[in-house]
Amino acid sequence: MTISETWMGRIDVMKPWLGEEEAQALAEVIASGWVAQGPKVREFENAFAATQHAGFAVATSSCTSALHLALVVAGVQAGDDVVVPSFSFIATANAAAYVGARPVFADVDLHTGCVTAATIKAALTPATRAVIAVDQGGVPVDLEPIRALCDPLGIMVVEDAACAIGSRYRGQPVGSNAELAAWSFHPRKILTTGEGGMLTTARQDFGDRARRLREHAMSVSAADRHASLLAPSEEYLEIGFNYRMTDLQAAVGIVQLGRLEAAVRRRREIATTYASAFAGVEGLRLVGDPEYGMGNFQSCWLEVGPTFPLGREGLMEHLASDGISARRGIMAAHRQPAYAGADTGAAELGVTEWLSDHTLILPLYHELALHDQVRVIDSVLRAAGQP
């Protein structure tokens, strides 16, 4: 423990915003006796679909499982290629591998960290069946040009909106322009259910099949089966998965969804404070809103350029010495042992590698007090050589 942690307390990079409302919602589900997937999951799905302007929503055990289901219902299979950003959590690429497809890595835009139509085009192959476009760190991806490229070619575009609940794209909720979108409710996200995810889709056939597949492809849902006195017999229509969410998780999600606007507003306030403090500091760039949308600041990531006195690693060490937790930016999946040396396409990934080497995540969460924001700012400015 550093001296700063001892005297002033540690500042974590994130904390979930949970309270008595979530505790009460959990208590009510426990008292009901129905804790597995059931009526609360359906309520959460309906509320989430309405919030995101989606036709159908299917709750899952994680965003990774939602991505897997998205590719399955889209018909992606062994022998196909799926274009994905390397600049993303490794689950994005893994989802393609789960269906036997080949992940083909695309580069990203320097300013947003997101794939573009141009970077995707550079990675397309004759075997490309799908593209996964990520809203990196909550920054919305520019989806319209990507779909304009892919739709005429019969390439399915899946939006990995893991970080983007509450973000906006051209005035609409992120994900509302996608045929398939996957969401995460991990504790690092703005809306959390502990663990969990959601698949949203504009197509009923996709939604119906994903709903079956998430519980072993049963012809009758477990909730309907257990609710019936007649105990209807079920059939298993294909090989499915156990990707269910519990009513305990969904009850928390319903409360969290009601706080979404307040959560995004608060994060943007803190990000604005950081941006104002770091404006004009040589070698620093806070990743902000693109011209076509509004981010939720699920993560507050800072690009540390070569003119910054300490570099990225030095800045992280300096922050740690002041009792402040920071994290390296997004990984480059093509550098990980799981994919290093594998045939993952021939696209140049220079921007991906630059951003992976030169970005870090600063503390940002709902209950980050003003005096702690000032501590973070003061530490960064001192590292920059400013008084």
Residue map of PLM features:
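N-terminal "arm"/small-domain region of PLP-dependent enzymes with the aminotransferase-like
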Residues: M1-W34, P39, E235-L237, P363
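Phosphate-binding glycine-rich loop
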Residues: W34-D81, A95-V99, F105-D107, Q172
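A short alpha/beta connector and helix-capping loop motif
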Residues: C114-A123, G171-L180, R375-A383
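PLP-dependent aminotransferase-like
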Residues: V72-A161, R168
